[in-house]
Structure formats: C-alpha cells, structure tokens
Amino acid sequence: FDAEDSGGIDGWDWIQGSTHYVSQLSTSRIASINAMILVDMVGDSELRLPKESSSTRSLQNDIWNIADSLGYGNTFLDSIGTPILDDHRPFLDAGIPSIDLIHVPFPWYWHTLEDTPDKCSAESL
C-alpha cells in the first residue's frame, strides 16, 4: 500500500493507502476476505517476529504453529510485541482477521540513509 509512512508530513496521516483501499471495499467483499497477512520489514539478517499485540490472536497462533512445525521457532517468537500502527489496522477495524508480521525492535538504521539493501538477508526473505 502506498503512503504507509506518510504520517508527520503536513496534511497527511499514517497508513493512507490501506485506509483508502479498505474504505472502497463493499460489505460483501469485506465478508468474503478470510484474512489479511501483512508482511513488513522481514528482510533483516537477525529477523525476529514477536506477535504484534493488536493482531488477531487466533490467526497469529495458526501462523506461529505452522512456522514452528517447519523449524522457524527461533524467528517466530512466542512473545507478545508492541502494537504497531501499520497497514493491517484498517482491515482489523473492518472486522477482517489480520496480522502484522514485522521485525521489532526496528533496527537502528530504519528510515535513515543507512537503510540499504546490504542490510537484507536472503535467508530471512
């Protein structure tokens, strides 16, 4: 979604693209969506994914159980992280089960000139 990180720019709020997208969905379309899985910031070489605290818990548990059975228990942490204002929020607000797969804490170079491709890991991706 576009304009996810636009908050702070004069006249803009956060998560603009996903908010607009969900606002355009019909009631029947919303009812037809089983889940929304947001994959955000998953390229870090030291990837750790706690359970983002505003995400749908049952969906998280399903995904984390699958990850654990596939040997990714060291990445998908059995701990609750902080709530993140992210593109899953409008879907949650519309009643769609949603999770945010996001690496936290954010690395020191996040949103700086040092946030470059060399920080990404093919293994994490």
Identify what each model region corresponds to:
Residues F1-S58:
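Acidic/histidine-rich catalytic neighborhood of metal-dependent amide-processing enzymes
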Residues A35, D44-L125:
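Active-site-adjacent substrate-binding region
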